């Protein structure tokens, strides 16, 4: 059952290279710095930093869309959500083998490196790879009928 336009959020997702999504949604879920946050129409306005993770949208047509986010910022107004990120990938753009290789490389760097700045970078790369892999796992579980938005 469709929802009226007056009950939907206008959502924009962009990264440094392109506009990823522009449309109307009934729900947005994003990985805020302090935990996952869900946004519905008429939400209290706020601005938050986003950590690596997944963005989930429920579109005007009732379709669920999934994106990987490397980190960024989200601004929420009562009827609008804007997400600005370093990198955003649609779920179908994620390369599982590349994410596994990045995970292994980051784990190796964490084991071998004692320089604090280098360890911080390796940890961030590990978080990014794990976020991509978790999103793929969620989608596989969803295909098997075991998971919902």
From Swiss-Prot:
Source species of the chain: Methylococcus capsulatus (strain ATCC 33009 / NCIMB 11132 / Bath)
Main subcellular location: membrane
Subunit description: F-type ATPases have 2 components, CF(1) - the catalytic core - and CF(0) - the membrane proton channel. CF(1) has five subunits: alpha(3), beta(3), gamma(1), delta(1), epsilon(1). CF(0) has three main subunits: a, b and c.
GO cellular component terms given for this protein: plasma membrane; proton-transporting ATP synthase complex
Superkingdom: Bacteria
Family recorded in the similarity comment: Belongs to the ATPase epsilon chain family.
Function: Produces ATP from ADP in the presence of a proton gradient across the membrane.
InterPro entries according to UniProt: ATP_F1_dsu/esu_C_sf (IPR036794), ATP_synth_F1_dsu/esu (IPR001469), ATP_synth_F1_dsu/esu_N (IPR020546), ATPsynth_dsu/esu_N (IPR036771)
UniProt keyword list: ATP synthesis, Cell inner membrane, Cell membrane, CF(1), Hydrogen ion transport, Ion transport, Membrane, Transport
Protein name as catalogued: ATP synthase epsilon chain 2
Presence of the UniProt keyword RNA-binding in the record: no
CDD domains in the record: F1-ATPase_delta
NCBIfam families: ATP_synt_epsi, PRK00571.1-4
Listed GO MF terms: ATP binding; proton-transporting ATP synthase activity, rotational mechanism
A Pfam family hit: ATP-synt_DE_N
Membrane-protein topology: Peripheral membrane protein
């Amino acid at each position: 059952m469709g929802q009226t336009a007056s009950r939907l959020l206008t959502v924009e997702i962009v990264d440094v290279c392109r506009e990823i999504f522009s449309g109307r949604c009934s729900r947005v879920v994003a990985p805020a710095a302090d935990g996952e946050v869900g946004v519905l129409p008429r939400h209290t306005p706020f601005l938050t930093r986003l950590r690596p993770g997944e963005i989930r949208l429920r579109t005007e047509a009732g379709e669920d869309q999934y994106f990987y986010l490397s980190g960024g910022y989200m601004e929420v107004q009562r009827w609008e959500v804007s997400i600005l990120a370093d990198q955003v990938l649609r779920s179908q753009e994620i390369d599982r083998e590349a994410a596994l290789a990045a995970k292994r490389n980051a784990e190796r760097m964490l084991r071998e490196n004692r320089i604090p700045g280098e360890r911080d970078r390796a940890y961030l790369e590990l978080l990014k790879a794990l976020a991509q892999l978790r999103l793929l796992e969620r989608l596989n579980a969803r295909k098997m009928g075991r998971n919902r938005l």
